[in-house]
Amino acid sequence: MLFYAPFWQGVETLSIERRQALFTASLPAAAWAALLPSLGKELTSQRVSTVAAVLTALFALWQGAQAWRDRSWLSFTRASFHIIMFYLLITCLWFQSWYAIWPLGLAALLPPGHAARLAALFGYVALAKPLAFEPLWLWHRPLPPKEWRELRLGPALMALPIVYALMAWVDGKVRREKRESRETEGNQES
């Protein structure tokens, strides 16, 4: 605890206000960069961070309701995985490469399939940030403006995992509909 004492500034150390102006390598950072010229730094930071927090809370509530209805032994793990992936891909304000470890533990608890593949893909893409994207855009001198970097880095990093997540969601929906259709046909024949 003593090692953290120099960083403690009272209860506001834990508040969201301190973090609402920190944006990097994420979709909210790209939104921040796009809105900055029209709204100004303070208002843009406040609005983007508030929208991200509200979206995260709504998604978590929806996933909690899904897990409550499902009641299988994997429902909590699945909902937790979906929430952490939603947060990292869509609403995380300040993304760092090591955050990609978070979903791996949950994916390991789920049956082989889309979750494990998404977690692995996300890990590879996150590792590409310092190995590919940063040299491509951040090694130039003078350094491009922060707004220019954020408009490109977040969407470039998150595009492939988001596309995969959407494809997995559509695939799951199609499979469920086919299964329900077969069950309905089987019940009608009986």
Where are each of the predicted segments found?
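Transmembrane helical bundles and short interhelical boundary loops of multi-pass, membrane-embedded
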Residues: 1-87, 91-94, 110-177, 189
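Generic transmembrane alpha-helix motif of multi-pass integral membrane proteins
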Residues: 101-110
